[in-house]
C-alpha cells in the first residue's frame, strides 16, 4: 500500500467531514446514496443518508483491473480505491470544482473496477496512454485521472489525447484539495 496516498485521502476525508460539521452541523449527507446499502450509513432522514467513512474490508488492491488488461496499475491508485469506504466528496483544486469518487460498499467496489476496466479498454482502442479516473467535473466530457505511466494527476477530456497536468502525484493532489459543500 502507498501510505502517502492513503494518509492524504484520510486527511482530505477528515477535512471534508469537518466542513460538514462546521457549516451544516451534521455528518456528510447524500440523497444520491439513499437506499444503497453501505457500512458508511449512520442515519437516514427523509430520502437522504448521513454517512461517515469506514475502513476498507476487502483485499487492498484493484488487481481485477490489472488482470483484465494485463497491466500493472500504479500503487497510489490501489491505495486510493482501497483505503476506505465513503461517499463521494466535493472539492476544489486549482479553481476546478470536482467530485472525488469513492467506493461506497463491497458491491460498489466491483462496479468501480468494471468502470475502470471499461475506461481503459476505450483508451486502448483509441491508442491513448492509460489513465484511471478519480473524480468527475461539471463537464461530462472531462474527468480528473491519474496517468498510469507517470503517476501524475491530470484533467483529461474523455476520448481524446487532451490532458492538463494538475499535480505530480496523487498524494500531492489530495493534500492540496480543498473541501467544498
UniProtKB/Swiss-Prot annotation:
<keyword id="KW-0472">Membrane</keyword>
<keyword id="KW-0997">Cell inner membrane</keyword>
<dbReference type="GO" id="GO:0009898">
    <property type="term" value="C:cytoplasmic side of plasma membrane"/>
</dbReference>
<comment type="similarity">
    <text>Belongs to the Syd family.</text>
</comment>
<dbReference type="Pfam" id="PF07348">
    <property type="entry name" value="Syd"/>
</dbReference>
<comment type="function">
    <text>Interacts with the SecY protein in vivo. May bind preferentially to an uncomplexed state of SecY, thus functioning either as a chelating agent for excess SecY in the cell or as a regulatory factor that negatively controls the translocase function.</text>
</comment>
<dbReference type="InterPro" id="IPR009948">
    <property type="entry name" value="Syd"/>
</dbReference>
<dbReference type="InterPro" id="IPR038228">
    <property type="entry name" value="Syd_sf"/>
</dbReference>
<keyword id="KW-1003">Cell membrane</keyword>
<protein>
    <recommendedName>
        <fullName>Protein Syd</fullName>
    </recommendedName>
</protein>
Amino acid at each position: 500500500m502507498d501510505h502517502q496516498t492513503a494518509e492524504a485521502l484520510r486527511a482530505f476525508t477528515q477535512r471534508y467531514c469537518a466542513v460538514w460539521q462546521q457549516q451544516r452541523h451534521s455528518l456528510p449527507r447524500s440523497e444520491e446514496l439513499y437506499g444503497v446499502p453501505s457500512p458508511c450509513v449512520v442515519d437516514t432522514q427523509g430520502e437522504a443518508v448521513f454517512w461517515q467513512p469506514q475502513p476498507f474490508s476487502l483485499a487492498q488492491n484493484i488487481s481485477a483491473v490489472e488482470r483484465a488488461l494485463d497491466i500493472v496499475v500504479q500503487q497510489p491508485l490501489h491505495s486510493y480505491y482501497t483505503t476506505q469506504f465513503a461517499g463521494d466528496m466535493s472539492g476544489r483544486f486549482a479553481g476546478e470544482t470536482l467530485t472525488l469518487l469513492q467506493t461506497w460498499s463491497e458491491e460498489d467496489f466491483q462496479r468501480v473496477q468494471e468502470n475502470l476496466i471499461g475506461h481503459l479498454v476505450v483508451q486502448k482502442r483509441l491508442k491513448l496512454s492509460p489513465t484511471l479516473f478519480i473524480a468527475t467535473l461539471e463537464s461530462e466530457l472531462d474527468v480528473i485521472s491519474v496517468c498510469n505511466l507517470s503517476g501524475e494527476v491530470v484533467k483529461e477530456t474523455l476520448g481524446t489525447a487532451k490532458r492538463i497536468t494538475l499535480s505530480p502525484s496523487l498524494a500531492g493532489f489530495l493534500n492540496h484539495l480543498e473541501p467544498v459543500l
